[in-house]
Amino acid sequence: LRDNMKELVNEAADGGVKFLVCASTPITTLDDVKASIEVLNKTDEACKKAGIGFAYHNHDAEFRAVEGQIPYEMFLSQTKMQMELDLAWATKGGKDPVELFKQHPGRFPLWHVKDLDKEMKNVLPVGEGIVEYKRIFDAASTSGMKHFFVEHDMPKDPWASITTSYGYLSKMLSA
């Protein structure tokens, strides 16, 4: 985005993309975070002008302090962009997704849905770990969720993982 943001936004808009998502940005120092916020704000404005949404996808690092500040909190307070909240990484980072929804209603139209083991070291199929999905999905309207994406980073058996996740979510959402 720093180098070719306008080109990316135009290509996304021309291709009919509804959301452009930034998957990561430098956050090693506070200066990195501030520079990232500037780029994210410019990208958000360009996306609005192009008629598409813009969101930021988190990992757990955004919830760790950088020089006394939490990058994710800075993103929420210093930008107007929307968020693609990775619910497992937020949980690993010590943030309660439902509390984020309450504090920033409507800012989370996109979710990444996966699960974590008790030690928060291994990704699991949805429903087999510690992420409180029933509670989180009950707060979907507060979050502004429009789409969610089930993922599992590097599963041993992708078909078994997605089948388990689908079964859990189907049962939970139909209850």
What is each stretch, according to the model?
Residues 17-19, 109, 146:
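Short acidic/polar active-site loop segments enriched in Thr and Asp
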Residues 23, 114, 151:
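Conserved residues at the C-terminal ends of beta-strands
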Residues 128-137, 143-150:
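H/E-rich (His + Asp/Glu) clusters that bind or coordinate divalent metals
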Residues 49-130:
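Acidic/histidine-rich catalytic cores of soluble enzymes
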